[in-house]
Amino acid sequence: MSSPARSPSVGGATPKQGARTPTRGIASQDVETPMRMGPGRAVRPSDNISLPPTSPGNISLPATSPARGLGANMSEIDLSSPLNYGTPSSMGSIRTPRSGIRGTPLRARPDIRTDKRIRQVAIGGGSGLEPIPEKGSETTDPVSESSQAPQLVVWGTNVVVSQCKSKFKSFIMRFIDPSAEQDEISENIDVNQPLYLQKLEEIHTLEEPYLNLNCAHLKTFDQDLYRQLICYPQEVIPGFDMAINEMFFERYPAALLEHQIQVRPFNADKTRNMRSLNPEDMDQLISISGMVIRSSNVIPEMREAFFSCNICSFSTTVEVDRGRINQPTLCTNCNTNHCFRLIHNRSEFTDKQLVKLQESPDDMAAGQTPHNVLLYAHNDLVDKVQPGDRVTVTGIYRATPLKTGGLSSSVKSVYKTHVDVVHFRKVDNKRLYEDEEGKDHIFPPERVELLQLLAKKPDIYDRLARAIAPSIYENDDIKKGILLQLFGGTKKKHATLGRQNFRSEIHLLLCGDPGTSKSQMLQYVFNLVPRSQYTSGRGSSAVGLTAYVTKDPETRQLVLQTGALVLADNGVCCIDEFDKMNDSTRSVLHEVMEQQTLSIAKAGIICQLNARTSILAAANPAESQWNKRKNIIDNVQLPHTLLSRFDLIFLVLDPQDEIFDKRLASHLVSLYYVTRHEEEDTMFDMSVLRDYIAYAREHLSPTLSDEAQQRLIQAYVDMRKVGAGRGQISAYPRQLESLIRLSEAHAKVRLSNQVELLDVEEAWRLHREALKQSATDPLSGKIDVGILTTGLSTAARKKRADLVAAIKENLKKKGKVLTVPYQKLFSDIKEGSQIMITREQFEDALKEVQDEGAIVVMGKNTIRIC
C-alpha cells in the first residue's frame, strides 16, 4: 500500500526497503499528547526535545502488505501518517500520475511544507509516548501485528491522525449549507443535500482536483477540528487531503485526475490586519486582504535533485531539504569519491511566484503609509492574481532566518516573514465582476432570465442610470455618460486595415464649479469597478501613473513597478483635480488615451505595456468659479490636445436658482432619514447593476446595422455642415469614432448584439448635449469643436490674424527706426483698434510676428525691427 519514505542518502547510499514495525500494544485513551504551550508557543532549544534528522516528508510508518485493498482493511489506512500517505489514487494504479511516495499530500504541496523537523509518536498502552522509528525493524512480530494498532499523533500537537480524518469525513458526509449558492458562484447546488459531496461530484465532472473549503462551515460543524486547522495547518491539511482522496476514489474508482485532490481552506476566522501580524501567528493559518501591486515571473523551485555518477553512470535522487541539496559524496556502485553531477532535466521542479500584497486603504491607520506583505504562490496558484487585483489571501504565516552573508552558514537572529498561499479569493460584493480575457463568469439560469426580462423594459436605460450614484441629485446626462462608460464599446482588431486596434474605452471629463459632487461621482465609480484606481492630480507624478524601475529585494535585479494607469488595465482610472497636474504628468496620458498602450524605456528596460483604461477625470476652473465669458480652455487651463481625446466633456455648474436650491436641499436632507426599506431597494439595484454590466460586457459584441451606419454617416456630415458657412469646424473624425463607441455601449444596455437606429440617436443626443456645454464659443454662442482641437475658436483665430496684420502695418510706418518701445507699440495698436485688446492677446500676436522673423523681442521693454 505504501512504502517507507526516501531520505537524502548519506555518502551516496541508496534507500533500503524497510520491514514492518511491531506495534506496541493497545492504544490508551487516557494518555495526553505533548502539545505546544498555546498556539503561539514554539519549540525552544531549552526544551531539550531531540528531533530525528528527517525532513517533513521523510517519516517512516508501519509497512503493510501490498495485497491489501481498501475494503475490509481500512484501519490499516488509518494508521498511516498524514505526512507521507499514499492516497488510493496511487495504490498500484495508473489512474493518477505522481503515484508512490512522491505523490503523497505533503510532497505534492509545497504551499504547506515546513522547515520544521516533524515527527510522530504512537500512544502505547503502558510505555507512554514512543517515537515512530525512522526505518522498519529487520524482524517482524506477527503476533503484535494482529493486535490493535496504536493511535498516531504529530509530535508537539494534539492532532490525532485517525480522529482528524474521521471527523473531516463526517463533515464532508453530513454538512448541509442552506446558503450554498451565495458562497461560491456555482450551478445546480441543492441546498438540501451535503454541500461538499456535490462539490466532489463537480470535481469528478470537471476533472479539477481542488476542493475549496470554507472554514466558517467547518467551525459551525466541529470547533475542535477548526481550531486544529488554524493552529496546525501544515499537519492537518495533509490529513484532509488523505480523507477527501479516500472518499473520492471510493465513490468514483475509475476517475482520472491530473493529480490528487488538494483541500484549499479559505475564509479563516483568524483574519488579521497586516500590521497586527506578530510572532504568535507563526505557522498558523491566517487570512489577510489587500491589493496586489507586483507579481514576479514564474520561478522554478527544485524539489528533488537527480545525480549521476561520472564514472559508472549510477544514479540517485536527493530531496531538497530546507532549500539545500546534500550532494552525495561517495558512489556505492564504484566506490569513487566526489564523482556525482547534477542532471537538471531529470530533477523535479515546482512553480513558484513572488507576489507583493499592499494594505487596503480601509485597513490603514491614520497618518500611516501602506504596509506590504510578501506572498509565495506555488503550482496552480501561480498567475492566479495580477497587479491591481483586490484579493483575500489565506495562507500559512512563515518566518525564515536571514543569512549573515558570504560562505558562512550562520544566520542572524532577525527573521524575515512571508505567507505561503493556500487560497486566493477575488470577491467583493460591492464591486462589479472583474473583466478577464478568456474567462466568463457563471450566472445562474434564473439570474440570466431576470436580466433578459429587465432588458425588454423600455425604461431600462433610465433605470440603470438612476442606479448610478443615487445619492447625487439630478445630473441625469452625466450619469448616463458614466453608465455607457462602464459598458464600453466593442473591442475590434483589424490588422488588415492598417490599424492594430480600435479603442473601445470611453473617456469622460467633468468640469465645473467646486462643490458640485464631481469627486463623489469619481469615488462611486472607483468603489464599483474591480480594476479601478483613484488618484489626485496634485499628488500624482508621471512615474506614479506609468511605471518606474526599482530593485527587487529578493533577486537584487532591476524590475519594472507599474503605476496607476497600468494597474487599471481593463478598468477605470479616476483622476481628481485634473487641472492641478503638471505638464510632464499630463503628457503621459496622450498615448494611453488613444493608443491604449504605454511605452517605457528606462534603465535598459524597453517595453510596451497594455493600458486599456477608461479615464474619468474631474477638473475645477482656474478662477474657482466658472467664467461664462471664457471658453473651456481658458477656464480649466488644460491643453487642447488632451481635451480632444475625451469622448464626453460635461460641465457641472451651480445654477444659482432658488427653486433648484430648494429641491437640492430637500434631497440632501432626505438622505439622513432613509428607511430600511429604501436601503434594501438600493442594495437590490446595486446587485442588479453589477450583474447586468458584467453580463453585457462578457457576452455581447454589438455590430452596426445598415440603418445605424447610414445614420452615423448623416450625423457626421450634418455636424460638419453646421459651421461650414462661417468657416468653423464643428466635427472631426474623433467625434465620429466617439459616436460609434457610444452607440455600441447603448446597444449593450439593451443586451442587443445589433446597433440599431435608436442607439445612434441617443448617442448623438448625448454627444450634442456635451458639446453644447463644453465646445460653445462664448463670443458667438455657436458650437465650435476647434476650441477642443486647436484651443482657439474661429472668432478668436480671426481676431489674432487681424491683430498680427495691425502690428505689421504699424511697424512699416516706423520707417528706418531700428527699435520700438514695447509699451508704445501696445498703446498705438490699442488706440487704433475698434475692439478691446488685452495684453495677453497682444503678446500672442507679437509672438506670432516674431516667429515669422519680422521682429525680435529684446527683454521686456524693447522690440528690434528686422
Swiss-Prot record:
One of its GO terms (molecular function) is ATP binding. Its EC number is 3.6.4.12. GO terms for cellular component: CMG complex; MCM complex; nucleus. Keywords: ATP-binding, DNA replication, DNA-binding, Helicase, Hydrolase, Nucleotide-binding, Nucleus, Phosphoprotein. It comes from the Eukaryota. A motif (Arginine finger) lies at residues 644-647. Residues 1-67, 81-107, 124-145 are annotated as: Disordered. GO terms for biological process: DNA replication; DNA strand elongation involved in DNA replication; double-strand break repair via break-induced replication; mitotic DNA replication initiation; mitotic spindle organization; premeiotic DNA replication. Phosphorylated by the catalytic component of the Dbf4-dependent kinase (DDK) complex Cdc7. The keyword ATP-binding applies. Residues 47-63, 81-93 have a biased composition (Polar residues). Its main location: nucleus. Residues 460-669 form the MCM domain. ATP binds at G512, D513, P514, G515, T516, S517, K518, S519. Belongs to the MCM family. Acts as a component of the Mcm2-7 complex (Mcm complex) which is the putative replicative helicase essential for 'once per cell cycle' DNA replication initiation and elongation in eukaryotic cells. The active ATPase sites in the Mcm2-7 ring are formed through the interaction surfaces of two neighboring subunits such that a critical structure of a conserved arginine finger motif is provided in trans relative to the ATP-binding site of the Walker A box of the adjacent subunit. The six ATPase active sites, however, are likely to contribute differentially to the complex helicase activity. This is DNA replication licensing factor MCM4.
